[in-house]
Amino acid sequence: MNDQVIIFDTTLRDGEQALAASLTVKEKLQIAYALERLGVDVIEAGFPISSPGDFESVQTIAKHIKDSRICALSRAVAKDIDAAAEALKVADQFRIHTFISTSTVHVQDKLRRSYDDVVEMAVKAVKHARNYTDDVEFSCEDAGRTPIDNLCRMVEAAINAGAKTINIPDTVGYTVPNEFGGIIKTLFDRVPNIDQAIISVHCHDDLGMSVANSIAAVQAGARQIEGTINGIGERAGNCSLEEIAMIIKTRQELLGVHTGLDHKEIHRTSKLVSQLCHMPIQDNKAIVGANAFSHSSGIHQDGMLKNKNTYEIMTPESIGLKNKALNLTSRSGRAAVKSHMDAMGYKDNEYNLDSLYEDFLKLADRKGQVFDYDLEALMHFANLRDEDDFYKLNYLSVQSGSVMSTTSIKLQCGDEEKCEAAVGNGPVDALYQCIYRLTGYEIALDKFDLTAKGEGEDGLGQADIIANYKGRKYHGTGVSTDIVEASGQALLHVINSIQRADTIAEMKQQKFATV
């Protein structure tokens, strides 16, 4: 049996379902680039039939990602499969992933069909997908609660129809490791054509068993694991791929398998997903939490000083967690900035050097020394901006008193610069009143967070907001050494997204009115 475990990432599809506001195409592409650097074998980029935005995201990622196979999800319905194929056709290598429910409760109460009908639908879907590609994956939704005889029958039929990967999901996170591993073992024992497909698993974390179940499945013969970065996903989330990666690496002698991942990209990828998805990582999260490599007990510290192996089973460096790199200053040129970006593994097409260098100089003038983590924060924020942003903050002045604050701003509104001042309950409230008045948009804020993106008093701060406008949620991000400015950038990020959507809607309305 092959000893490589294929890593299938569904952060951009299953993971995104947990977010309050959907990721933009640009944000999804940033994450896809990071997954490609990490060495993920398959990236499930989205569900094309679900929305025009998802179709565009899959198509864009399929066009730009070269080293990972791009996958799109579809129900066992011809029009879904057609949409997936259309979005994926620009990819160098792609996979169509189709699925249908197999558990008794799903078949009877959701599909309201006989099991014979469901098997027939699955076979037709796989055969239809094979018209577009040889790489077809079929999933038995809620396999963890499917009667084993029915599951064996479905798997055999899907393989006969041409599926090259069979995915066994624990959709509601119901099983425990011995039980789930037993399901996989039974499939290998009872399905006669099982050797013609790779067995995959997709475990949810409702009972906190997703990672353990996935490892049990590998021990029983599964050779693909599906999951997400940081374990994000619906309800309690998905299997954490960074945990899977380091379990397989750390316990390779026991498990006898390996992955093709570049483990030193784990920390950076985790931070990016956390930042763009607006989902903080808990401090005690395995592998990537802030405390993952901390030792506060005196006994532990004494042991670590004598021999790190006493309490450390893996090193921070093994996941790419480094101390400060050589710093840059305002005297550093473009070549120095590019050299640092190259050393961190970023490709030229992942950022605009001129824009990054301009932001770098502003930051260097403010804080003197700029480190690699600062450059990354600047790059990610710059990638969220659009050159055609209608509103841009040109000037900000804040006066804070013991009770109220006054904020004055100059805001670029298209070709015109406008000025406004307001008094508020704190500088951010006053700034937001200025922006609301000048733009005409009044936004309902559902969530407001400030986080540090660097170290020390002069480190970058990131503001993240979830805003509600006309029933739709938007995510805005801002980065600056000044948290008030970062807060303003986050609100303008949202308002520019709304303004852009309103403009497109108005253009479509005018187009149809003239037809």
Swiss-Prot record:
Key words, A-Z: Amino-acid biosynthesis, Branched-chain amino acid biosynthesis, Cytoplasm, Leucine biosynthesis, Manganese, Metal-binding, Transferase
Cellular localization per UniProt: Cytoplasm
Statement: the UniProt record of this protein carries the keyword Magnesium: no
GO process annotations (BP): L-leucine biosynthetic process
Gene Ontology MF terms: 2-isopropylmalate synthase activity; acetyl-CoA C-acetyltransferase activity; manganese ion binding
Region (Regulatory domain) residue spans: 392-515
Reactions accelerated catalytically: 3-methyl-2-oxobutanoate + acetyl-CoA + H2O = (2S)-2-isopropylmalate + CoA + H(+)
Cofactor(s) listed: Mn(2+)
Pyruvate carboxyltransferase domain: residues covered: 5-267
Enzyme nomenclature, EC number: 2.3.3.13
Alphabetized PANTHER family for the sequence: 2-ISOPROPYLMALATE SYNTHASE 1, CHLOROPLASTIC-RELATED (PTHR10277:SF9), HOMOCITRATE SYNTHASE-RELATED (PTHR10277)
Family: Belongs to the alpha-IPM synthase/homocitrate synthase family. LeuA type 1 subfamily.
The protein's name: 2-isopropylmalate synthase
Organism: Vibrio atlanticus (strain LGP32)
Upper lineage: Bacteria, Pseudomonadati, Pseudomonadota, Gammaproteobacteria, Vibrionales
Gene name for this UniProt entry: leuA
